[in-house]
Amino acid sequence: MSSGGLLLLLGLLTLWAELTPISGHDRPTFCNLAPESGRCRGHLRRIYYNLESNKCKVFFYGGCGGNANNFETRDECRQTCGGK
């Protein structure tokens, strides 16, 4: 196979991996956790994955502690946990 063909194949595989939705079996287990504001008193707007609605939603984070179901952007949440 030529180098151009290999690059095309690599590009198609990368595109497929980016566009394939995350299934429940592939989703990290922390995506199932409820949002936790943590023990500090900040008021930071963050995003968490909501398993019941299959959506990334807003919550307010205190700034420390909490759990890993805590993202700065919806895109980061969607890429990690799936959802809308």
Curated annotation (Swiss-Prot):
BPTI/Kunitz inhibitor domain sequence ranges: 31-81
Signal peptide: 1-24
Coiled-coil stretches noted in the UniProt entry, renumbered to this chain: none
Record-annotated site: Reactive bond for trypsin: 41-42
Keyword annotations of the record: Disulfide bond, Protease inhibitor, Secreted, Serine protease inhibitor, Signal
Any one Pfam family match given in the protein's UniProt record, by short name: Kunitz_BPTI
Organ and tissue specificity: Expressed by the venom gland.
Disulfide feature: 31-81, 40-64, 56-77
Any GO MF annotation of the entry: serine-type endopeptidase inhibitor activity
Keyword check for DNA repair: no
Subcellular location field: Secreted
Keyword hit for Transmembrane: no
Gene Ontology CC: extracellular space
Function: Serine protease inhibitor that inhibits trypsin.
Family assignment from sequence similarity: Belongs to the venom Kunitz-type family.
Protein name according to UniProt: Kunitz-type serine protease inhibitor 7
